[in-house]
C-alpha cells in the first residue's frame, strides 16, 4: 500500500523548529513579524520599507495581530520591540523607511464610517482616549513612534510628508481635511549608504535635483484587496536611494506585497513577513511566476 503524501503544498515549506533561517533569494514568510525576525541572520538586509497596521482600526480575527493593543503605549512598545530586531537584521549601512498613520481620540465612540465591504473587520468601537489626551485630540502616533525609536538607538534622519493629491475627502467641518501622512527615514549607524543621485526628482526649471521632503504620490487601490495598498511610487525612491541591484529589502508588514513588486521591477531581492494567511495568498498571487519562496513559520 503506497504511503500517504504528507508533503506540504508545492512551493511551501513548513518550519516547526526555531532554527535559523537562511535567505536564498526573494522570500515571503507567513508568520508573526517578531518570531520570524528573531530567526533571520544579522546584517542580512540592506533596506527596510514598511507600513505597520494602524492602531485600533480593524480586527481581522488573527491572533497576535498588531493594532489591537488596549492602549497606545502598548502598541508603541510592541512596535519598538519589532524594530529592535529589524535593526539587528539590517546591515550597518542600512536604512529604514517607515510610514505609519495617525488618528484622533474618540471617547470610546463607535466608528462613523464602518468598513462596508468587510463589516466584520471593522472595530465596533474606537479604543479609549489615551491617558493624557482629550476627546478629539490628534494622537500624534507617527511622531510618538519616531521619538521612541530614536530613544531606542535609531538615527532619525528625515521626516517626509507624503502628500496625497487624490486623498479621500473627510466630512469634518471643524478642522482641515487630512491629505498627508509621514514617511520617516531612519538609519542604523551615523554613516550609511545613500545614493542621492539615484533618487533625484524633476526640478521646476528642468533637469533633476536632490529629492525634497514633500512627496506628491497618489494613493493606489488594488482591485484584489479591500484596502488601499502602499503606492509603488512611494516605495521606489526609498529603494533607489538605499540599495544597489541585488540587495535585500525587508518589509515585516508585507500586506499585499507591493514592496515585493517594486523590488522585482528594480532588480532587488525582497523579504516579506505577513501574519494574515489571506494577505499571504494575495501577495503570492501578485508575485506569481517570479520565483518567490513562501515559507510558513509556526509561532514560537
Swiss-Prot record:
Q: Which GO terms describe its biological process?
A: DNA restriction-modification system; methylation
**Which reaction(s) does its UniProt entry say it catalyses?**
a 2'-deoxycytidine in DNA + S-adenosyl-L-methionine = an N(4)-methyl-2'-deoxycytidine in DNA + S-adenosyl-L-homocysteine + H(+)
Mark out the compositionally biased spans (Basic and acidic residues). 112-127
Any single GO molecular-function term of the entry would be: site-specific DNA-methyltransferase (cytosine-N4-specific) activity
- Cellular-component GO terms for this entry: cytoplasm
Q: What Pfam families does this protein map onto?
A: N6_N4_Mtase
**Top class in the EC scheme:** transferase
Keyword S-adenosyl-L-methionine among record annotations? yes
Is Methyltransferase one of the keywords? yes
Map out region (Disordered) in residue numbers. 109-129
Keyword list (alphabetical) reads: DNA-binding, Methyltransferase, Restriction system, S-adenosyl-L-methionine, Transferase
**Enzyme Commission number:** 2.1.1.113
Similarity remark: Belongs to the N(4)/N(6)-methyltransferase family. N(4) subfamily.
UniProt cross-references to PANTHER family, sorted A to Z: RNA METHYLASE-RELATED (PTHR13370), TRNA (GUANINE(10)-N2)-METHYLTRANSFERASE HOMOLOG (PTHR13370:SF3)
Designated name of the protein: Type II methyltransferase M.XycI
**What's the source species for this entry?**
Xanthomonas campestris pv. cyanopsidis
State the taxonomy lineage.
Bacteria, Pseudomonadati, Pseudomonadota, Gammaproteobacteria, Lysobacterales
Amino acid at each position: 500500500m503506497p504511503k500517504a503524501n504528507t508533503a506540504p503544498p508545492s512551493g511551501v515549506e513548513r518550519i516547526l523548529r526555531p532554527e535559523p533561517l537562511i535567505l536564498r533569494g526573494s522570500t515571503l514568510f507567513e508568520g508573526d513579524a517578531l518570531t520570524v525576525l528573531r530567526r533571520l541572520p544579522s546584517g542580512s538586509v540592506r533596506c527596510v520599507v514598511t507600513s505597520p497596521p494602524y492602531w485600533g482600526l480593524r480586527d481581522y480575527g488573527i491572533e497576535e495581530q498588531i493594532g489591537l493593543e488596549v492602549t497606545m503605549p502598548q502598541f508603541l512598545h510592541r512596535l519598538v520591540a519589532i524594530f529592535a530586531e529589524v535593526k539587528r537584521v539590517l546591515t550597518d549601512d542600512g536604512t529604514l523607511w517607515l510610514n505609519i498613520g495617525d488618528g484622533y481620540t474618540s471617547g470610546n465612540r463607535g466608528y462613523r464610517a464602518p468598513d462596508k465591504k468587510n463589516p466584520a473587520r471593522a472595530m465596533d468601537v474606537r479604543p479609549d482616549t489615551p491617558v493624557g489626551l482629550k476627546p478629539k485630540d490628534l494622537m500624534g502616533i507617527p511622531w510618538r513612534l519616531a521619538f521612541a525609536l530614536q530613544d531606542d538607538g535609531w538615527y532619525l534622519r528625515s521626516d517626509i510628508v507624503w502628500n496625497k493629491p487624490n486623498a479621500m475627502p473627510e466630512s469634518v467641518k471643524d478642522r482641515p481635511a487630512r491629505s498627508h501622512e509621514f514617511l520617516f527615514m531612519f538609519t542604523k549607524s551615523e554613516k550609511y549608504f545613500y545614493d542621492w543621485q539615484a533618487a533625484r526628482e524633476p526640478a521646476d526649471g528642468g533637469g533633476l535635483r536632490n529629492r525634497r521632503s514633500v512627496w506628491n504620490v497618489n494613493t493606489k487601490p488594488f482591485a484584489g484587496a479591500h484596502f488601499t495598498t502602499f503606492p509603488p511610487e512611494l516605495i521606489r525612491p526609498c529603494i533607489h536611494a538605499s540599495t544597489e541591484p541585488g540587495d535585500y529589502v525587508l518589509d515585516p508588514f508585507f500586506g499585499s506585497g507591493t514592496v515585493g513588486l517594486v523590488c522585482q521591477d528594480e532588480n532587488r531581492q525582497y523579504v516579506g513577513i505577513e501574519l494574515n494567511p489571506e494577505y499571504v495568498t494575495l501577495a503570492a498571487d501578485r508575485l506569481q511566476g517570479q520565483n518567490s519562496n513562501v515559507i510558513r513559520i509556526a509561532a514560537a
